Swiss-Prot record:
Signal sequence, start to end: none
Residue ranges of coiled coil: none
Organism of this sequence: Treponema pallidum (strain Nichols)
Domain of life: Bacteria
Name assigned to this protein: Uncharacterized protein TP_0179
Region described as Disordered: 57-82, 96-121, 160-184, 198-232, 247-277, 335-358, 449-579
UniProt biased composition (Low complexity): 169-183, 336-357
Biased composition (Basic and acidic residues): 450-464
Length: 627
């Protein structure tokens, strides 16, 4: 910021008023930014240079002739003075009231005369002139209120303006400017000046606060006049009365009512104002604010301490409640652990001979009825069964697969008259039953065959001891063996082939150990029929197993001797008895088949009841004692 320029030394009758393009201009000092802006807007007189170089009335009286001429120009000897004034002030428009001719009755030494006889505008100017002459002139860059001088050369004149204060363009005014006045520059409008001033970052001053301080604060007491007063005295009491009486004539300006706030804890970033006078009031205010701040900090510390204490108490309460909950849970767990759970009653294992309850097709009889089978029936079951070596795991898988396939293939709700799928279901059930018989009867097969061989040996000895002529005529072992084989295979079908199976190999070995020698026997190939439960013969096979009427099987063998014929009556005793475990297994299989029959639709059950296989099926259940 440039230093404030002193008013140059010039004659007492210097030109501070001039006319430019028919507009009366006057110069305003650049000592106060707020006053400078106020002068640009309203053209009023604040700290005018006439307080040093003469009054406005003297200048207007001496140069009234030149001011009236629209094309008046400055005299050559006064152009240098104008440039000197341009260095320390700004030319502004003169308000209309300043253009009125001064009253000749009053002199500059009599301040009351203009107020009594002059027009209102001249009287106001005279009062303002006297008041501002009484104010001391500040030569430094800052006045008593801390306002910094405005450098017009740097902020206004160097920037230039697009419009003159009177509304003329800057280009027209530059053309009309005198050629010798090089320091002449147009004054920008107030709005442009305020905008540009607010954008500057050198010194920012709150205009509203400054205006408030200018309007509300009283002018300081005069410390002395740099120039003699017109009345010969610096007493301004009489002018205070005039100002109060003429306050209604002065224009009213908006004043920002926001007070200036000071912060004792946060100092201003710009630092203290240089040259600001020490104020006791400010010092007391700062001390009071410091005490208040210390007290506030203490209260805040106590409040924070109380808050922390409350927080600790709450945490302690929460911990105690959690501990109580844990104790309660521990007691609950201990009580539950102490109480022994109720033991389920142990179920005694069912005895081996206990019969399972059946809810089959024939459920009228007592389920505990014992099974009564003849030796011939059991022998027929064993002989007609096919014993094959199979993996137990595969058999079980096939058994379950057969069950599932049997259920999945049931055609519920199909058209009447189509019974082809019924036969497939029956065959699947029979196939499952056959596989179970094979697995369950394999364990007891060896013992039963051995018993059959022993019985056959005893029968042969009895036949040999019989003194009948038939035995004497033909008592060859081959005939006896053929007779036994034909008797044991009476239940087989006439057209079914028999598998070769040496059932009586061990019997020949035992016969050699008897007391009487026997000739060498020729082995006969005996084929045992294999029962493959195919679809069309499943029910026929079951019927053949329970049928007592047997068809003789044509076996290629040598002709039987007459000695072996009397032994046919005892061949029925050679059928091995059925073990209890095997009977249970057979009964369980037939019961399972009965339950499968119940799962069929009603139409299929009725169809089976009307068929020729129903009587055979019922007879088989009656013989086995299955209800």
């Amino acid at each position: 910021m440039t230093q404030a320029l002193q008013v140059p030394s010039a004659p007492a009758r210097c030109r501070h008023l001039r006319r430019k393009n028919g507009v009366l201009l006057r110069i305003v000092e650049k000592t106060d930014r707020t006053r400078y802006a106020h002068a640009l807007r309203h053209g009023c007189r604040h700290r005018m240079c006439e307080g040093v170089h003469g009054t406005e009335e003297d200048a207007m009286g001496s140069e009234s002739a030149e001011m009236d001429s629209p094309h008046a120009t400055a005299r050559p000897q006064e152009q240098g003075e104008d440039r000197a004034w341009d260095a320390c002030g700004v030319w502004v428009k003169v308000p209309p009231e300043a253009q009125e001719p001064p009253v000749s009755s009053g002199g500059p030494e009599d301040p009351e005369a203009p107020a009594q006889h002059a027009p209102p505008g001249a009287r106001v100017d005279a009062v303002r002139h006297h008041v501002y002459r009484a104010l001391p002139v500040q030569s430094s860059a800052e006045d008593s209120r801390g306002f910094v001088d405005l450098s017009v050369e740097d902020e206004v004149l160097a920037r230039g303006c697009s419009h003159a204060p009177g509304g003329e363009s800057s280009s027209d005014q530059a053309a009309d400017a005198p050629a010798g006045d090089a320091a002449y520059s147009e004054v920008p409008s107030f709005d442009d000046l305020v905008t540009r001033t607010a954008q500057s970052q050198d010194d920012r001053v709150d205009l509203s606060a400054a205006m408030s301080s200018v309007v509300t604060e009283e002018p300081p007491e005069p410390r002395g006049c740099s120039m003699p007063c017109p009345s010969g005295s610096c007493d301004t009491t009489e002018f205070d009365d005039l100002l109060s009486s003429l306050s209604h004539d002065a224009p009213e300006y908006p004043v920002d009512s926001d007070p200036i706030t000071y912060s004792a804890s946060e100092p201003s970033s710009e630092g203290p104002v240089r040259g600001a006078p020490f104020s006791d009031v400010d010092a007391v205010a700062q001390s009071l604010m410091g005490d208040a701040q210390v007290a506030a900090q203490g209260a805040q510390a106590s409040t924070s301490g109380d808050a922390s204490t409350d927080l600790l108490l709450k945490i302690a309460q929460e911990i105690s409640s959690i501990r109580a909950d844990l104790d309660q849970l521990k007691g609950t767990f201990s009580r539950q652990a102490g109480a022994e759970p109720a033991q389920a009653p142990a179920t005694a294992p069912a005895p081996e001979g206990t019969e399972a309850a059946y809810s089959g097709f024939f459920c009228d009889d007592d389920p505990d009825e014992t099974i009564a089978l003849t030796n011939d029936e059991l022998n027929n079951i064993l002989i007609t069964s096919e014993f094959t070596e199979e993996d137990g795991k595969d058999s079980a898988a096939d058994a379950f697969g057969g069950e599932l396939s049997g259920f999945e293939s049931s055609h519920i709700g199909s058209a009447a008259g189509d019974f082809s799928y019924l036969e497939e279901d029956d065959h699947a059930a029979a196939r499952v039953a056959q596989e179970q018989w094979v697995q369950q009867g394999r364990a007891t097969l060896g013992n039963e065959v051995f018993d059959v061989k022993e019985q056959g040996a005893h029968a042969d000895r009895d036949a040999a001891a019989d003194p009948s002529p038939v035995a004497k005529d033909d008592a060859s072992p081959e005939a006896q063996r053929a007779h036994v084989s034909s008797t044991g295979l009476d239940a087989a079908g006439a057209e079914q082939p028999l598998n070769t199976e040496n059932v009586f190999d061990d019997e020949d070995t035992q016969r050699e150990d008897t007391s009487f020698p026997l000739p060498e026997e020729q082995e006969l190939d005996v084929s045992v029929p294999s029962l493959e439960f195919s679809a069309p013969h499943a029910i026929e096979t079951a019927a053949s197993e329970s049928s007592e009427v047997a068809t003789p099987v044509a076996i290629e063998s040598p002709p039987q001797s007459e000695a072996a014929r009397p032994a046919q009556g005892d061949s029925a005793n050679l059928a091995p008895p059925l073990s209890k475990s095997l009977a249970d297994e057979v009964r369980s299989v037939l019961g399972y088949m009965d339950r499968l029959l119940e799962s069929l639709p009603e139409e299929k059950i009725e169809e089976f009841a009307r068929s020729e296989y129903f009587h055979t099926y019922k007879h088989l259940f009656d013989e086995l004692g299955i209800s």
